[in-house]
Amino acid sequence: MQGHLSVWLVKHGLVHRSLGFDYQGIETLQIKPEDWHSIAVILYVYGYNYLRSQCAYDVAPGGLLASVYHLTRIEYGVDQPEEVCIKVFAPRSNPRIPSVFWVWKSADFQERESYDMLGISYDNHPRLKRILMPESWIGWPLRKDYIAPNFYEIQDAH
């Protein structure tokens, strides 16, 4: 079933896939990485002027990585603003997604955290570097196939 925004995107020839609605009735759409930046700009102009959150997750061991954006259409005098959830999937072998920092500045630290934990590279992000882990850290801790390094030495009980 297509929601209001999906119908609008189809009407304007914008490629996407409807993933239905979440438990709160928020429409969820899948956008290809190569289409994401242009659609993000269009959504901003259309009124989705607030990036409420951005996160990422590992879909399955050895599978795709997903970057998730929760957008809100803030308007004066509207008590229940429209919301949409956008999912952009990238291959684990080369996880590259265009940054939306230049559309929504609040994407800054959120995209950096997704990079730091899952290794998704956000193209054209002005400061894409680790934010939680030390720069010397090897690997991406939230990937399902991540093997944690052995930090703890067995200490002598004496």
UniProtKB/Swiss-Prot annotation:
GO MF annotations, alphabetized: NADH dehydrogenase (ubiquinone) activity; quinone binding
Catalytic activity from the UniProt record: a plastoquinone + NADH + (n+1) H(+)(in) = a plastoquinol + NAD(+) + n H(+)(out); a plastoquinone + NADPH + (n+1) H(+)(in) = a plastoquinol + NADP(+) + n H(+)(out)
UniProt xrefs under InterPro entries: NADH_DH_suC (IPR010218), NADH_quin_OxRdtase_su_C/D-like (IPR037232), NADH_UbQ_OxRdtase_30kDa_su (IPR001268), NADH_UbQ_OxRdtase_CS (IPR020396)
Highest rank taxon of the organism: Eukaryota
Gene3D superfamilies the UniProt entry points to: NADH:ubiquinone oxidoreductase, 30kDa subunit (3.30.460.80)
UniProt keyword terms in alphabetical order: Chloroplast, Membrane, NAD, NADP, Plastid, Plastoquinone, Quinone, Thylakoid, Translocase, Transport
GO cellular component: chloroplast thylakoid membrane
Protein name: NAD(P)H-quinone oxidoreductase subunit J, chloroplastic
